[in-house]
């Protein structure tokens, strides 16, 4: 049963469907379909969100807070995410890293559905260094932001063996070990990213928004006029 609502934008409201000590389930209303996010806090300022989307467009952020580091992984479907005047695309297995903007535009889902994960790190609330959780994990959120998001850049890479290993296990975590397992996997992910080669970025996954909008308009026109010759 829905327990609370708050406005995300003029067109989107966030409804809390379920909440307990370990996770919160949100429904994002105001879309042309169904969008559900299941969010688990892992460490102070660090959370993991599972997205189950059956819609063509939706605002993915539940708050207007800016500055957070977001690590997006696509498991199924497609996502087109506007960012910095451009738009990046993720297909199954792809990974993107961005720094959240308070004025982010809604994401689009060309196939009408999307399933994936976002790991969010709020540098204002997260520890300066994650070695406080596990010795020798010398990873600083500020250093990851500088590495992947310098000059408002968006880092996108195709699936690799390392990325697939980390995220495939996050989609099938037994409930009984979920809380501790998330902590281990998030530390593994961030340590992995701290050593990730920047040359693995895929700049061709990003396109100007004007080009994306034109392609969407052409696609919509063709769908509306399929019987015309």
Model region roles, listed by residue range:
Residues 1-41:
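A short, N-terminal "cap"/entry segment at the start of jelly-roll beta-barrel domains
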Residues 26-141:
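N-terminal regulatory/effector-sensing and dimerization cores
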Residues 42, 184, 225:
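Conserved strand-loop elements at the edges of beta-sheets that form or border functional pockets
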Residues 46, 66-69, 177, 181-184, ...:
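Short, well-structured alpha-helical interface segments that form or flank functional binding sites
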Residues 136-185:
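Amphipathic alpha-helical segments enriched in hydrophobic/aromatic residues interleaved with Lys/Arg
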Residues 157, 209-212, 229:
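Short, well-ordered coil↔helix boundary/capping segments
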Residues 162, 207-218:
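N-terminal positioning helix adjacent to the helix-turn-helix/winged-helix DNA-binding module
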Residues 167-181, 190-203, 217-229:
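Basic, amphipathic alpha-helical hairpins
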